[in-house]
């Protein structure tokens, strides 16, 4: 509590409801770390306003990307995050694809001569797997043994397919606007959250749900 108070006393600006320089990283970090207290909604509003003021584009880099992406995701702003990422301009992943990148590049603009095989901007991976595909640990658990599967289709996405390997085997998710198929490895179990909020408890094996 004392450290949070000291942090807010030093960096929070009540007149603008922002932190530090007011940049996207400056506001996303304390939001993600739970330092904003009663000012959470105001700081979140300031963050969203800054994103929109930049044409729905990010201004973060290697340090701030993860906190921006996860702050938006954890506050239900996945459609905004999708709009920030689903384009072919710089800064953005589409610009790298447009210029022939087959691996992540060190700079948003791959033509700047830096490394062409660099995980510098790879923090989006967490959002793809944990939010879009919805592959998560059940709260209070670790190691992807007790799973929470909660896919989120945003924007104009028609489907999402993903798989990842845990200590227990391959976990796979295939979700469309009308169905969800999951494959849970032996030794694991999962809570499945359907789009209407209905929860299903399943063990290992392949399970399909229509909605």
Q: Where are each of the predicted segments found?
A:
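Conserved small/polar residues in nucleotide/adenosyl-binding loops
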Residues: 1-5
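Secretory-pathway/luminal and periplasmic proteins that interact with or process carbohydrate-rich
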Residues: 6-14, 92-95
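Solvent-exposed loop and edge beta-strand segments that line ligand/cofactor-binding
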Residues: 9-27, 47-65, 111-120
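Well-ordered alpha-helical scaffold segments within catalytic/enzyme domains
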Residues: 29-38, 67-75, 130-135
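Alpha-helical repeat scaffolds
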Residues: 40-48
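Repeat-solenoid scaffold signature
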Residues: 53-92, 99
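Non-catalytic C-terminal accessory modules of carbohydrate-active enzymes
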Residues: 82-211
